[in-house]
Amino acid sequence: MAKCDMKMPEDFLLKISKLDSNFDSVADTVLQAGGEVVLKKVKSNLSSVIGRGTKFKSRTTGELEGALGLSPSKLNRDGNHDIKVGFAEPRSDGGSNAKLANILEYGKRGQPAKPFLKPAKTASRQECIDAMTKALDEEVEKL
């Protein structure tokens, strides 16, 4: 039977060992820093696609853009910390912001797709990683 040993870099292991009981609060701070970067990119992409390329005059109210936000960091069932960029529900007219965002992202019959989430995800990936790394380094230095 084959055996494989994976070793983490020493400097990373030292950072993690310094966190000890403060890990949860540090994870929240780091995820918040990364989430803010992605949220900013999603907001700019959303504002650039709303009302663009329509056959009729746009009826946008700004409610979808105003409902975009960042969830608090939570622990999922696998024990991992998560943070989500999403839309607050429901709309003032009783509709769903997620439904409207889905129609914008993927289109529907007679309405072409205007992706804003997927391009934001790919464009902000490295910037998000950098922001989270910087936030982790700052939190470790505080300890």
Where are these regions (language model features)?
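Short, Lys/Arg-rich flexible segments
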Residues: M1-K84, S92-D93, A98-L143
